[in-house]
Amino acid sequence: MFEAPVPMPRLAPQPPIYFCPKAAGEFVLDGNINKPFWNNVPFTEDFVDISGGDFPTPRFRTRAKICWDERNLYIAALLEGNEIWATIKQRDSVMYYDNDFEVFIDPSGSTHNYMELEMNAFNTQWDLLLTMPYRNGGRSVTAWNMPGVETACMISGEVN
């Protein structure tokens, strides 16, 4: 019998599941997660490195709250840390070297032709379409703009 080693995938075959409740109440875009709108929306599990379990647990806690209504998807993130660093102020600039928050939206679940939105502490946005993951030879379409996106950022502390 022929046996070949099968490497363990770098990412868990089944990502964590988050129940995304329907929004209740009136939403105000101001970056403040401590408002009644968010009170009944549960936090996600703490975020981990996208590269998988072989990587260390992040030094600082990051988690999010997500809900929806007939018109919008609402995402609030709480990023903890004692240093808030941002340099990028021009839209659609590579910003993952800053402290940033990234959202990946893959409606088909195929990891192909998915949307990415990043924002930093200055509320600078980088939205792009990815043909497939970079590790699989994917290319980003930075000229693409995510329709209807609005963001806000609230900082507790000083930037830089």
What are these regions (language model features)?
Residues 1-160:
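Structural preference for beta-rich elements and adjacent junctions enriched in aromatics
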